[in-house]
Swiss-Prot record:
Function statement: Component of the cytochrome b6-f complex, which mediates electron transfer between photosystem II (PSII) and photosystem I (PSI), cyclic electron flow around PSI, and state transitions.
Keyword Membrane: yes
Protein name: Cytochrome b6-f complex subunit 8
GO cellular component: chloroplast thylakoid membrane; cytochrome b6f complex
Summary of subunit composition and partner proteins: The 4 large subunits of the cytochrome b6-f complex are cytochrome b6, subunit IV (17 kDa polypeptide, PetD), cytochrome f and the Rieske protein, while the 4 small subunits are PetG, PetL, PetM and PetN. The complex functions as a dimer.
Compartments where located: Plastid, Chloroplast thylakoid membrane
Lineage, top ranks: Eukaryota, Viridiplantae, Streptophyta, Embryophyta, Tracheophyta
Alphabetic keyword roster: Chloroplast, Electron transport, Membrane, Photosynthesis, Plastid, Thylakoid, Transmembrane, Transmembrane helix, Transport
Membrane topology: Single-pass membrane protein
GO MF entry, a single one: electron transporter, transferring electrons within cytochrome b6/f complex of photosystem II activity
Organism of origin: Gnetum parvifolium (Small-leaved jointfir)
Amino acid sequence: MNIVDIAWAALMVVFTFSLSLVVWGRSGL
């Protein structure tokens, strides 16, 4: 596993996390 794979994995995790936060915020949690 090289640095590019780690960077892509981290980017996907951050993107998914922020997206779910936006969805939660709009749901009025």
